[in-house]
A protein has these predicted regions:
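Transmembrane helix-loop junctions in multi-pass membrane proteins
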Residues: 5-11, 36-38, 62-68, 209-222, ...
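Pore- and pathway-forming membrane helices of multi-pass small-molecule/ion transporters and channels
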Residues: 23-27, 82-86, 103-116, 229-239, ...
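Hydrophobic alpha-helical transmembrane segments in multi-pass integral membrane proteins
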Residues: 56-68, 115-126, 262-280, 337-338
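Internal alpha-helical transmembrane segments of multi-pass membrane proteins
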Residues: 71-82, 96-105, 277, 284-299
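Generic multipass alpha-helical transmembrane bundles of integral membrane proteins
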Residues: 79-253, 268, 272
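C-terminal transmembrane helix-loop-helix hairpin of multi-pass membrane proteins
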Residues: 129-133, 196-204, 243-258, 265-338
Length: 338
C-alpha cells in the first residue's frame, strides 16, 4: 500500500498504482474471508484482513481522478473511508469470532466518513476536521459498553414470572399463577457475552485510532489551540481508561492517550515557529534554546508522573481521595474538549 501510494507524485490513485492496490486489496480480502468462513482460522483471517484494508483505502481514494492542479483532498479521503467501511463490515460479518480488529476499523472509518462529509459540506480545513474528530472519539467512549451489549443482544433486564399482585386463592395455592419457565440457555448467554466483549474491544480500538489520527494532525499543525486540543485529547484518553475493566480495553485506551502525547511532542519538536527559525538562522538561538528547555522539562515531568503513578498504584492502589480528585480532573479535561 505504501509503495503504490508513493509511486505517483501527486498521489493520484486513478492510475496504474491504484489498480495494483485494488487488486492486492481484493485478493487479500478474498483470502481473509475464505480463511475465516471455511477454515475458521482467526489469526490468518485477521492478518490477511488487516493487510487488505490499507490497500483498499489507497484504491478507494482513486475512484475519482484529481482535479487538474490540485492534490488529494476531502473527496478522495471520503471515498477511502467508504471503501474501508464496506470491506471492514464484510470482514466482520464473515468472521465467526475474534473480529475485534475489524470492528475497530468499522468504527474508525464510520467516524471518518461522517467528519469528512461534514468537512466537505462546511468547507472545513484539516485542523478543524481533526478538532471535530477528537471530542467525538473521546465522548463516544462512555456509550460503548451499552452499545456493545445491544449489538451482542445480551438479555438485559428481568421480567418477574409472578404477577405483580396476588390473585384470588393465591394463599391457598402459592404455585397457582406460576407459569412454566424454559430452562436458561447458559451456553448461548456465555457466547453472547463473549461476543459483546469482542465488540467492545473493537469499538474502543476504533475510537482510539480516531483520537490518535486527530492528535497527529493537531500536534503537527502550527495552531496553538490545536496543539492544546491534542494535549487535552491525550490526557482525556488516559483518564477515560477507568471506564473499562478488561486488560485489552484499558490497554487500547492508555496506548491511544500515550500515542497522542508522543505525537504532540514530536510535532512540537519538528515544527518550531517561523520566527524562531529565522532568528536561529541569523545566529540568535536564545528563544529556540528556551523553547527546547521547556519541551525537555515538560517531557521529563510527564515521564516522572507516569512512572510515579505506575509504581504507587501497583503497590497500594488508588485511595478514595485521589479517586475523587481524578474524577473531578476528568470532568475538567472533558470540558476543555468542548
Amino acid at each position: 500500500a505504501f509503495v503504490t501510494w508513493t509511486a505517483e507524485p501527486r498521489h493520484d490513485m486513478h492510475s496504474f498504482p491504484g489498480v495494483l492496490a485494488a487488486v492486492a486489496g481484493v485478493l487479500l480480502l478474498t483470502f481473509a474471508c475464505v480463511r475465516a468462513r471455511v477454515y475458521d482460522d482467526r489469526a490468518a483471517a485477521v492478518a490477511l484482513g488487516l493487510g487488505a484494508l490499507p490497500n483498499l483505502a489507497v484504491a478507494g481514494s482513486g475512484l475519482l481522478p484529481l482535479t487538474d492542479g490540485d492534490g488529494i483532498g476531502r473527496l478522495q479521503f471520503l471515498l477511502a473511508c467508504a471503501v474501508v467501511l464496506v470491506a471492514a463490515v464484510v470482514l466482520t460479518l464473515v468472521s465467526p469470532r475474534g473480529d475485534g480488529p475489524f470492528v475497530a476499523f468499522v468504527c474508525a472509518s464510520a467516524i471518518g466518513l461522517f467528519t469528512v462529509f461534514a468537512a466537505t459540506v462546511w468547507r472545513m480545513e484539516a485542523v478543524e476536521t481533526a478538532a471535530l474528530c477528537a471530542p467525538l472519539a473521546v465522548g463516544a467512549l462512555a456509550f460503548l459498553p451499552g452499545l456493545a451489549m445491544r449489538f451482542a443482544r445480551l438479555p438485559i433486564g428481568f421480567a418477574s414470572p409472578h404477577a405483580a399482585r396476588p390473585t384470588y386463592g393465591a394463599d391457598l395455592d402459592p404455585d397457582a399463577d406460576r407459569a412454566p419457565q424454559d430452562p436458561v440457555d447458559a451456553d448461548r448467554i456465555a457466547a453472547q457475552a463473549r461476543r459483546g466483549h469482542e465488540l467492545l474491544i473493537g469499538l474502543v480500538g476504533g475510537c482510539a485510532l480516531v483520537s490518535v489520527g486527530a492528535a497527529a494532525v493537531l500536534g503537527f499543525s502550527d495552531d496553538g489551540w490545536g496543539q492544546l486540543l491534542a494535549l487535552a485529547t491525550g490526557v482525556a484518553m488516559l483518564m477515560r481508561a477507568q471506564l473499562f475493566r478488561y486488560t485489552a480495553q484499558v490497554a487500547a485506551t492508555l496506548a491511544a492517550g500515550l500515542a497522542c502525547l508522543v505525537l504532540l511532542g514530536v510535532g512540537l519538536c519538528l515544527n518550531p515557529s517561523d520566527s524562531l527559525m529565522r532568528d536561529a538562522l541569523n545566529g540568535d538561538t536564545a528563544a529556540l534554546d528556551l523553547r527546547t528547555i521547556w519541551l525537555v522539562a515538560a517531557i521529563a515531568a510527564a515521564a516522572v508522573l507516569c512512572t510515579a503513578v505506575g509504581l504507587i498504584t501497583s503497590r497500594s492502589g488508588v485511595t478514595p481521595f485521589w479517586g475523587r480528585f481524578l474524577e473531578i480532573a476528568e470532568v475538567f479535561v472533558l470540558l476543555t474538549l468542548v
